[in-house]
Amino acid sequence: MSTDVSTLIDRYVRDIPDYPQPGVVFKDITPLLSHPTALRTAIDALAEPLLGSEIDLVAGLEARGFIFAAPVAVRLGAGFVPLRKAGKLPAETLAESYDLEYGTATVEMHADAVPPGSRVLIVDDVLATGGTGRAAVDLIRRAGGTVVGLSVLLELGFLKGREKLADVELRALATV
């Protein structure tokens, strides 16, 4: 990815120690979100490598992945699918549980959100342990979709989340 984008992320993503629990260093993207040029640059950088690709849907992971996934979907001419925390969707759902850096969780989507054969890009803000990404990939595939890749703003390389996603094309705008 461009050095400019990586530098921008380094400048506008701050570390919050011991959040949400002691020992975790949380990557706070809110400074990037409040800076219009930084936000636009990040969204463009997530979308541009895939312009002209056959992508039917962009799936965004709750909550911060939504911020990037919806505008990426618009840029790619694709629909948007929210992947939500358990119990947040009103219709019948498919669910996948996973481990994350600081606990366990479940991700859900509407059972009819991904028609079989759909080509789906997954977008999130940060790749940490890879648990959330792995659950999203498995969920999309279980619905009959084809995962064309996983794109993230920031990869925490030291947590080795990429290893859980060896079967998926992974794009990170920056790695720390």
Curated annotation (Swiss-Prot):
Disulfide bonds: none annotated. It catalyses: AMP + diphosphate = 5-phospho-alpha-D-ribose 1-diphosphate + adenine. Its EC number is 2.4.2.7. It is found in: Cytoplasm. Pathway: Purine metabolism; AMP biosynthesis via salvage pathway; AMP from adenine: step 1/1. Keywords: Cytoplasm, Glycosyltransferase, Purine salvage, Transferase. Catalyzes a salvage reaction resulting in the formation of AMP, that is energically less costly than de novo synthesis. This is Adenine phosphoribosyltransferase. It comes from Thermobifida fusca (strain YX).
